[in-house]
């Protein structure tokens, strides 16, 4: 039976936060740099009169302009060539529908419906290893998690962390995660 690699979508596959911040900057005439965001609470970084409205921009249309994380497609292809089953596990926002699934297929990831999961608690999905940018999610995964470095998780100390897809694939080829 193939080992399963679970991949988060937001900011591991697709550059969602940079796209969201670009939209916010345009609408609110601001110059917020997504690389300065060091926490999950975006309301701490946007103008006070924007506040929670920042999350309203996470609708299905935003995914039309989301770019791919560098080397994500290459990395997924490498995992598949190495014989792993790749599944995409993501939390979904209200009013986004199938936008992430459609984005994946539009960008050549060739994902079947049974390899795409939307859920808040990713530990409910069976995988041998999870690559995610959310510290709490990786922590819940125990030894099965790898933290994908982003500015918002730099303050979190976690021993299994990668800064790029190239580094993740190198570690996979060297069997650093014991699969």
Predicted regions and their residues:
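Generic beta-sheet signal
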Residues: 9, 89, 148-150
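Structural recognition of alpha->loop->beta junctions
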Residues: 103-117, 162-173
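Conserved Lys-Pro-Asp/Glu-containing loop-to-beta segment of HAD-superfamily phosphomonoesterases
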Residues: 114-139
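Acidic, Mg2+-coordinating phosphoryl-transfer loop and its flanking beta/alpha structural elements
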Residues: 131-166
